[in-house]
Amino acid sequence: MSRIGKRPIEIPSGVKVEFSDSVLTIEGPKGKLSRQVMDGVSLEITPSSIEVKRADDGLKARSAHGLTRTLVNNMVVGVTKGFERALEINGVGYRAEAKGDVLNLSLGYSHPINYALPAGIIVEVDKMTKLVVKGIDKELVGQTAAKIRSFRGPEPYKGKGIKYADEKILRKAGKTGKK
């Protein structure tokens, strides 16, 4: 039995859970999320908790058991608290600006980068060098942060580029040169 999968998920007050035709819909104060539940896994919903059960002990069902529980828990946390990922921009002249649902980035290229944010994602810019990606879908927040980071990843010599706030960049020594 999956150690993660067998733990029940508590439903906080103000969260509404619906499950029909293998589609789970969770609605809370921050928004609404839906997800298709995998075959071989079923959900038992009570007014205070959700339990993930598997149909048999086959490899596919065992693999999906813990994963499904974690995905459902992330949905519950997302509609109640939300998720965020912080990014930092390092480099002379590197800056970011959020205008509605478009993020404008100047990263040392010959052209600015205008990145259209996915629906449900908000980016807050602080002092033009610190970004916070926020949303209710953990997967989408992570993908958006990774996409923004990919425009100019941190380089190991001077540390210029976009990095996660909690990321440590391994720095390399430059050329020593001939003497």
From Swiss-Prot:
Any one of the GO BP annotations: cytoplasmic translation
Any single Gene Ontology cellular-component annotation: cytosolic large ribosomal subunit
InterPro entries xrefs: Ribosomal_uL6-like, Ribosomal_uL6-like_a/b-dom_sf, Ribosomal_uL6_a/b-dom, Ribosomal_uL6_bac-type, Ribosomal_uL6_CS
GO MF term (any one): structural constituent of ribosome
Alphabetical UniProt keywords: Ribonucleoprotein, Ribosomal protein, RNA-binding, rRNA-binding
Superkingdom assignment: Bacteria
Pfam families: Ribosomal_L6
Listed PANTHER family: 60S/50S RIBOSOMAL PROTEIN L6/L9 (PTHR11655), LARGE RIBOSOMAL SUBUNIT PROTEIN UL6M (PTHR11655:SF14)
NCBIfam families: L6_bact (TIGR03654)
Quaternary structure (record): Part of the 50S ribosomal subunit.
Family: Belongs to the universal ribosomal protein uL6 family.
Protein purpose: This protein binds to the 23S rRNA, and is important in its secondary structure. It is located near the subunit interface in the base of the L7/L12 stalk, and near the tRNA binding site of the peptidyltransferase center.
Protein name, as recorded: Large ribosomal subunit protein uL6
Organism: Geobacter sulfurreducens (strain ATCC 51573 / DSM 12127 / PCA)
Biological classification of the source: Bacteria, Pseudomonadati, Thermodesulfobacteriota, Desulfuromonadia, Geobacterales
Gene it is expressed from: rplF
